[in-house]
Design a protein with these regions (language model features):
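Surface-exposed, polar helix/loop patches in the mature regions of secreted/periplasmic/lumenal proteins
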Residues: 78-120
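Short S/T/G/P-rich N-terminal loop/turn motif that feeds into the first structured element of a domain
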Residues: 9-76, 84-91, 117-121
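Bacterial N-terminal signal peptides
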Residues: 1-8
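Generic hydrophobic-segment detector
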Residues: 3, 18, 53, 100-101
Length: 121
């Protein structure tokens, strides 16, 4: 079944039109209960500094959850990293500064949610 699904997805992807537009890399964090406010602040600061350390990053926006809907599943922080294209995102993912950030942040993070999309505008 997995093979059939993989073939179906591959066939669909091959027929899909190539989208153009800025790529948005959305990352949401749920911190461990043991994460201190100081550790969380250090992670916020370090994530924001990636723009000045990785040239392919167009912008980084972030904030904490303020939704009244109570559907956050414990995720408190959201970061949106903008790239010109998928190639730049791929460069970012393997960049030494990104890897250093991940190594620093991971011990305090209980869960992470990542979603990328190509913006229509």
């Amino acid at each position: 079944m997995v093979v059939v699904l993989g073939i179906a997805v591959s066939a669909f992807a091959a027929d899909a039109p190539v989208k153009k537009g800025k790529l948005r890399h959305v990352v949401a964090f749920k911190f461990k209960e043991t994460a201190t406010p100081e550790q969380i602040k250090a992670i916020e600061k370090a994530f924001g500094e990636l723009k000045s350390k990785i040239p392919v990053v167009v912008s980084i926006e972030w904030g904490t959850n303020v939704s009244p809907e109570h559907r956050d599943k414990g995720f408190t922080h959201c970061f949106i990293v903008t790239f010109k294209n998928e190639k730049d995102r791929d460069t970012y993912l393997v960049h030494p500064e990104h890897k250093k950030f991940v190594d620093m942040a991971l011990p305090s993070i209980g869960d992470v949610f990542v979603l990328d999309f190509l913006a229509d505008n």
